[in-house]
C-alpha cells in the first residue's frame, strides 16, 4: 500500500513551480511516474515522491513529446529535490525527533 498524505499534497500547492517558477494557481503535487516509487497501473506513486509543478510543466513531463523520456525523468527528479528543499526551507515541513532516541552512533 502506498503512502498517502492529503495535507502534504495541499501544502505543495502553495509552492511556486519548481521548474519554471510560476505561481499561477495551477501548481500541484506531480507524482513520480516510476515503478520504483510505487507507481503502478491506475496507482499513483507514494505521496512523498512528488514535485511541485504548474500545469504547463506537469503536462510537458507527463505527456511531452518534445523531450526524451530520460530528459523528462531528470527534470522531474530535479523538481522533486527542489520541492523537498522548499518544504523544509519555507518552514512548511519539519522533523520532530522522537523523545529518548539518544545520540546517533557514529560509524
Language-model regions: role of each:
Residues 54:
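Zinc-coordinating Cys/His ligand positions in small cysteine/histidine-rich zinc-finger domains
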Residues 51:
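Active-site cofactor/substrate anionic-group-binding motifs, chiefly glycine-
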Amino acid at each position: 500500500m502506498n503512502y498517502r498524505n492529503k495535507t502534504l499534497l495541499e501544502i505543495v500547492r502553495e509552492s511556486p513551480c519548481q521548474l519554471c517558477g510560476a505561481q499561477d494557481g495551477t501548481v500541484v503535487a506531480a507524482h513520480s511516474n516510476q515503478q520504483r516509487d510505487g507507481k503502478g497501473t491506475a496507482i499513483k506513486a507514494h505521496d512523498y515522491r512528488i514535485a511541485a509543478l504548474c500545469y504547463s510543466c506537469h503536462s510537458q513531463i507527463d505527456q511531452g513529446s518534445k523531450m526524451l523520456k530520460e530528459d523528462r525523468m531528470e527534470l522531474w527528479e530535479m523538481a522533486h529535490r527542489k520541492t523537498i528543499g522548499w518544504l523544509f526551507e519555507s518552514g512548511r515541513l519539519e522533523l520532530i525527533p522522537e523523545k529518548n532516541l539518544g545520540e546517533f552512533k557514529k560509524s
